[in-house]
Every structure is written in C-alpha cells, then in structure tokens.
Amino acid sequence: MGKLIVVGSCGVLVCVLASLYTIGNLLNEIEELQVEFQDGMVEFRAITQDTWARMVSKHINPTGHTNAPPTFETLFGARTARQAGFEQCNCGPKSEGCPAGPPGPPGEGGQKGNPGHDGDDGKPGAPGVIVAITHDIPGGCIKCPPGRPGPKGPSGLPGSAGPAGGNGRRGPPGPVGGPGEQGPQGDAGRPGAAGRPGPAGPRGEPGTEYKPGQPGRPGPQGPRGETGPAGNPGAPGNDGEAGKNGNAGRPGPPGHPGKNGVPGQKGEDAAPGPDAGYCPCPSRAAYKA
C-alpha cells in the first residue's frame, strides 16, 4: 500500500511539472507572436503610407516624379495644329467664364528629348514582410529564396489514447521456473489404517552369556516407610510382676456382672519373613515363650 502511494505521488508531481513547463512555453510563444504582430503592423503602416504617397503623386505629377527633368511641353507649351488655308490672327476678345470645349485632335509627335539624369536611390524596403498592396510598385514583390528552418519548437501535449489493439500472437512457452520456497507445514492428517504385519525379520545374533556375579554389599538403610494398617491382636502376654499396692480408692458403684466371652481359636503360625541385613532376627523360641 505504501509503494502505491509513493508511485502515485511521483506521477502527480511529474504531471504538475510538465504542465508548468508547457504553460511557460505557451506564454513565451504568445509574447513572441504579439511582438511580431506589432512589428508587422508598423511595417504595414509604413508600406501603406508610402503607397498612398505614390498614388497621390501620380495625380499631382502625371508626367512622373517631382524631381523628373522638364520636357518640351512643360517649357514651351503644347504646339497647336495649323489650320488649313492661311494663318489668321486671333485678335478678338477672349472668352471669360465659358465652359471648356471638347478635346482637340492629338498633336504631332514631338522631338525626342534628351536622356534624363539618374534617379535617386530608393528607400530600403521592409525586411521580410509580405506586401499586401502592390499598386505602382516596380517589379512587384521580390521573391527571396526560403530561409533556413527555424529552431525546433517545444514538444506538443500528449495525444489522447488510441484505440485498443488486437490480441497479439501467443508467445512461446517460457522456461521452467525454479522450485519455490518451502511452504508452511500443513495440518496433521487423519491417522491411517493399521498396516499389515511385516514379515519376520532375520534371526539375531546370539547374545553374550554372563555368569551371575558376587552379591553386592548391603545398601544404606532406607527411609522409614509409612505407618501400616493395624495388625491383628496379638496373643495375651505373660503376667507382669505384681505392682505396688495403691492407695485405697473410693468405693465405686457396683457394676453389672458381665457375661463370659467365648474363647477364640488359636491362630496359624506366620511364615518366616526375609532376613534383614542390618540386624539379626530373634529366635522363634522368644515368640513361643
């Protein structure tokens, strides 16, 4: 989960940086276009003013430029055609305020004038601008060879995702992978059924025969055992020696006479016990006494 967050954050950061770079390039291009447009407007105004001045000069000086050399007609006036017959002096009063008459017939061809002086050098033209008005421009537009290609522009925005392509061909089978890591120990299975008894094994080698050794020393005395159950009442003991006469007691109340009991049977002799290693056993005569 943490890796996905880091990868997503890096992707968003890259997109933001790319957007800022693209916006900066667009603003730079817009500023360059604005400067070029202003320069083009200045050059266009200069061309229109120059063209307008030339058009006006054509109406004011129809013979040519204002600095053109004078001609025969401008110095001596146009020659009038001679009337047929005889010359007549026009001494009558001149008309005043009369409308102009119809144009006369074209006159005879004049003499060839002297070659004029070389004209002044023209003004330098606008650098590299397409002239929209070509009226009265000698030779028209100058066709210049194409210039060098400009610098490479910035990369465009990434296009939209194209349609999904078809399924490719099935590739060859990959190599066999190595053995994976050992998995965790599985749960214990159910105990299986008892198997058949196996065949009898081979006969073993004869064992080593040992002779009984000498009896060992008696061990130390063990701890005292727990108290055993109460034994059967023993045989009546021998009469003891007569004791000293006691003090006369207070006479007690007379008791009820008891019944005589039945004498018990004589018990069987017990089996002799094991000999102990720490003390000699007493003789049987002591018990019979």
Curated annotation (Swiss-Prot):
Keywords from the UniProt entry: Collagen, Cuticle, Disulfide bond, Repeat, Signal
SMART domains: Col_cuticle_N
Region (Triple-helical region), start-end ranges: 101-130, 147-269
One term of GO molecular function: structural constituent of collagen and cuticulin-based cuticle
Protein name per Swiss-Prot or TrEMBL: Cuticle collagen 19
Protein task: Nematode cuticles are composed largely of collagen-like proteins. The cuticle functions both as an exoskeleton and as a barrier to protect the worm from its environment.
Top-level taxon of origin: Eukaryota
UniProt biased composition (Low complexity): 184-207, 223-239
Organism: Caenorhabditis elegans
GO (cellular component) term, any one: collagen trimer
Record's signal peptide: 1-18
Region (Disordered): 95-289
GO process terms (BP): collagen and cuticulin-based cuticle development; cuticle development involved in collagen and cuticulin-based cuticle molting cycle
Composition bias type Gly residues, residue spans: 162-183
